[in-house]
Amino acid sequence: MVRVAVVDRDYCKPSKCNLECIRFCPVNRSRKKKAVDLAEDKSRAVIFEDVCIGCGICVKKCPFSAISIVNLPDELEKVLVHRYGENMFKLYNLPTPKTGSILGIIGRNGSGKSTSIKILSGQLKPNLGRYSNPPEWDEVIRSFRGTELQTYLSKLANNEIKAVVKPQYIELARKALKGTVRDMLKKADERGVYSDLVKALNIERILDRSISELSGGELQKFLIAAVLSKNTNAYFFDEPCSYLDVRERLRVARSIVEFANPARNYVVVVEHDLMILDYISDYVVIMYGEPGVYGVSSKPYSTRVGINHYLKGYLPAENMLIREEEVKFKISARGESAGKQEFPILAWSNIEYTYPSSKFRLIVPPGRVHSGEVIGVLGPNGIGKTTFIKLLSGELKPVSGDILIKPERVVIKPQEVSPSIMSEETVLANLKKASQLVVDPTSWLYVELVKRMRINRLLERNISDLSGGELQKVAIAVTLAQEADVYFLDEPSAYLDVEERIAVARVIRRIVEERRKTAIVVEHDLMLQAFVSDKIMVFWGEPAVEGVASSPLDPREGLNLLLKNLDVTVRRDPESGRPRINKPGSVLDREQRQRGLYYIVD
């Protein structure tokens, strides 16, 4: 067995602890050669993997949960691709891009997806685990002899592959790029496709705006357009659907297929929205392992089979269990039974609201929401979804109509999360302020919100030090920990990987069912909405001008209405029950359109 010891440099704080990892280590106490010691600069602990016996005492004793130790099969070391440094993340295997098809990559955050993209795009040279004495390209290529990666890496080393990457974190572009969208895109255009891309991605309205003024979704589309403008033979897209609504996600997916030209080029997409990844990819690889500790790239699977294996939590080609629970989508059963013999928490008549400043108008027909229900809200950005919740909470007053049953308390998780939305300095203090029960390890609320969402190792961290995904999970936990009649969660899946999205969906359902309250969830990931929602409200209209909503509908009716507006047909996978987008013009697409069924449940 190979022992992998990782010390998280962000968590390890020797100056703030009693060095429990060193003091309690049985090897340190019984042998001359230490297994754990302080680094020379005393900034962190160092674990010597060849001496460590893997007892796990340091893992349990560390007050900051900074240490991880795992044992891996010896065979994995033969396919070690990269290690960042001493007691740092290890990557095994690499996804294999192929011309003629689009490669999709699925996996948890911290499992090596972005590292793989950096290597495949030439930003990072693999060191085969020898971080202190990195090998030359010839040795790296020899280690992949007999595989398709040998050819790819040979081209990469000889500069025959010119790669361009759409990064995962797009906020940095706002600070780095100066000028208008029009000027930047014309400057980036190496293929003469400027006009076609502007039309395909629907960005005409933002051409004269400065990069610094763009919203998250607008910035995302600008960067995708800039990447597709480049005359290269390898395109990499790291989470291209973040910040985008359903219509824009489909628009981006179609643009990537059309302009990246996968028939001649290498195209790789990392995406957590499995419905979009299924639509765009020809085959997938699954990144699994222990986040932040090690990651392994699976063998390639066809898209449908690979995603289903991922949802099952078992990879047959590797004989590897990657999750204990299987994810199944059973939409119709819950949708039909929801709300029976329950009391109403919300009710409203036909209401209308107009903003005095912008003249934006929202029209909502009568509706009623019962205890124990999760209401999914779907529709474009800027169409009135947040205005609707402000009307329900009493923050805004309708111009006509009335809220017939008003909730006593509404708690809101906003769309954009930042440290400024938290009132306390640390994660623990914010959770404790929301509810004393949520920080009690013996309570069900702690199990659901802290353990299930893996916030327990973040408790002592400062809010300002959290990543986007960590802050998102803390914001969700703080919202759901509070006592309220209605929980409003605006895009809770942003920054989260597939595993975390599933965990959040289960937590929302559990809290709502246990407390007999209501949750209203605005979410653009249709698969997540299908998983979590009892009823669905659909918003449509013209952004910033007029929004029209439906009443809360059965999931089948709601999704059918949304997809009809999007002009897309969707079927359910017979094995997993997950929604899958039909290819335009396919037999199923034509049959469903003829029947008027844009979403088929059975």
Residue ranges and their predicted role:
Residues 2-16, 20-27, 35-46, 53, ...:
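Pre-NBD coupling/linker segments of ABC/ABC-like ATPases
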Residues 98-108, 114-190, 273-283, 287-304, ...:
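ABC ATPase nucleotide-binding domain signature region
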Residues 189-207, 441-458:
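Conserved ABC ATPase "signature" region
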Residues 210, 239-240, 491-492, 499:
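Walker B catalytic motif
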Residues 210-214, 462-466, 470:
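Conserved ABC ATPase signature
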Residues 223-224, 252, 476, 504:
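Hydrophobic anchor residue at the start of the ABC signature
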Residues 249-263, 501-515:
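Helical segment within the ABC ATPase nucleotide-binding domain
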